[in-house]
Amino acid sequence: MSTTAVPSAAAQKQLKQGKVKKGIFSVIRHLVLALLAFIWLVPIAWLLLPSFSTDKGINFTRFVPESFTMWNYVSIMTQPDSVAQFPRWFMNTLVVACFNCVISTCFVLMVAYAISCCRFKGRKLLQNLSVTVNLFPGVLAMIAVYFVLKYMNLTNSYAGLIMVYAGSSGLGYLICKGFFDTVPVALREAAKLDGASEARIFFQIVIPMSRPILVYTIINSFLTPWTDFVVAKMILNSGVSTDWTVAIGLYNMLQKALVNSYFSRFCAGGVLVAVPISILFVIMQKFYVEGITSGAAKG
């Protein structure tokens, strides 16, 4: 004969109170998340909606335009003038971003592999020094970097800009190092016994196994010049608008004398700048997140 235990009244009351508290915390949590999502979405809407507006200036009276048009996008892409030369800016930024993507990715991965897998004198000191340098903002070195580039006649050139981006990328090797730390030592030792050099192990064994961290590094290397304003403004300071990157060009459109004529086109340009980044992230999101988590967990 089986018996079923019946909860006492006190136990039932305690269980009910626990469910109520859990429900209240759940509601509060969702309200906070909804508020954060709203705060995050407002700037996006503030950029997106005016880009479809028929009003050109910044002093519009409605958050949602009365009528929508694609003219701002068509104008900024197909009708460049002395102020808005967006196609040229876009191509300039794309060229710099692609070159930096290739150079920085190779640089970061090689540095990370050397620190993680190679044993040499001063390795620990070099690693600690790089971590210490990372504690200081890069803006502190901008004046020195500018005068070095000026001495080398590399100001107002894309080569100088790419050198700065690529040269500063190596300090971001820590997450990649954390990923390479997870590569089995026995795998590398077996390859060495077969006569493989360190370079061959890196390119033919480690890199094919490291797709998540490779994607993570590529995206970060592309985003740096694509979204940067400060370094680009410092180096490309000749005033020739055809040499500008997207960030400098769009910033120039917000000058007091221009903003009332170009604000809607500025918003359209901002949306167009975000499109390649969004597409790149959506396509590679899985590998990007995996690269961060796997590298950070070990590093």
Show where each model-derived region lies:
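A structural signal for multi-pass alpha-helical bundles of membrane permease subunits
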Residues: 6-7, 18-21, 25-299
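Short, intrinsically disordered terminal tails adjacent to the first/last structured region
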Residues: 1-12
